[in-house]
Amino acid sequence: MGDFFLDAYFDCDPHLNEPSVETGKTAYQVVRTRRQAGAAGTVVANLAALGCHQIDTIGYIGNDGEGFELKRALTGLGADTSHLIVDEGRVTPTYGKPCLVETAKTRAWQVTEELERLDIKNRRPTPARLQTRLIDAAHRCLSAADAVVVVDQVSEPNCGVITTRVRRSIEELAKRHPDKPFVADSRKRIGQFRQVSIKPNLGEAQAALSTSSGRSVAAAGDLLKRLRGRRLRPCFCTLSTRGMVVDDGSGLKHVAAFSVSGPTDPVGAGDSATSVLAIVLGAGGTATEAALTANLVASITVQQIGTTGTATRRQVLQRYQEVDARES
């Protein structure tokens, strides 16, 4: 449940650049377009790649071309979009991503640079009637769910799916169902979530507590402990190449990342981690097991350049075997 974005990639061949007659600026020549489900859609892509059989999507899109493409992308992943509300008064949130690609034979369609992004977002508050429909959808879907993922992507307060009212409704559902995992990820408001597991990165944790404390693992652990407070659910703080800190109420634990070689692209790594945490917790795993598996998946997705990566169960098992052999 949350903010579903369309990731619209425009791959441009720099060898075909032309000067614009009207402005004299560079007219980039698009040689390929790609449409993917982003933000909460990236979570869906990861859940699908890891073999989840029933994925309900709760959010809204506009009655526009971007909404059509986003819904098609989600359907292509096998997700149920019957609770993805089409609203005439909203636009479909979209990240337009022009990229330079190298099309030489040795590097066919390899992304070499991502240019300035173009954002389409709703900057007016989400109407009350739409919030009511979103809350009703959450109530309908909950009974059949093994876990709930909440993605609060929109920075502008109360302009996305996870408004204050919707967040409080989710918290009430989580309070009523303490045995069902709820995992929340928020770009700007992670400190406002109660009753659910949270997964900030270090910068988000610092912002939530209005502090610029150090970047050490110990400092991150202290931040997470303060954020968890009286929450009864496990909480996580991601540390990029240093892995993740976990607070499950029995003490802080640092779960190290798995090292990778070669170029990496962190786009979507946080969403993949959120997906895995929900899967493992929903299957009855411990918080530490969830963090370890999330780090394992992240070591795969960050090696997928110029796209929001995913990992299959086979890839995860293979990576685990590689790591196990290396450490034996």
Which residues make up each language-model segment?
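Short glycine/threonine-rich catalytic loop with a Thr-x-Gly-x-Asp
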Residues: 259-277
